[in-house]
Amino acid sequence: AGRAVYREANLYRAMEQLSHKNYKQVVKSVETSKEWPENLGVGKPYDNMIDNRLEDYLEAKAAAGQGDSRKTSALLAAVADYTISRSHFESGNLLSALALRESGKVQEADHMVAAWSTDFPENRVVQWCTAIYRGEKEKAVGMLQSRNDQTNTTPWEASFRDSNFDLIVRLFST
């Protein structure tokens, strides 16, 4: 839990700095969020097991703000090329779709988003991500307001927790 809080705090700081167009501080906070300090109780997993799409997406936004198109393209490509799980949906998939669209691969991004609704028709996170992708901010806000409503699931049915969702909600609510 310690490492997760450390990462989230640094990413929230990066988002705050991004809203103030303080791009150097965004990069610094993102780099810090990628660290795995030993005293936070968990060891670093293998690199291929780490989902850095949010960090890379924030860093791409900072690079774009600094006018570094080469770095922006490389970071967006890293976000877009992340291997997406077919067994469950992660809100980071929204970042992959946006990275594709921002890289000029609009059809591929649109196809990805359309597949979400087919593969996960009842998933509220999918519905929220689709609304954000399509620019339907009011619809997305309405979905968040009903987010804490009781659902008819038991604890053992809700086995997957999307640890990036709150961070991604924050990114698109600023």
Residue ranges and their predicted role:
Residues 1-4, 31-50, 77-88, 114-122, ...:
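Solenoid-like repeat scaffolds
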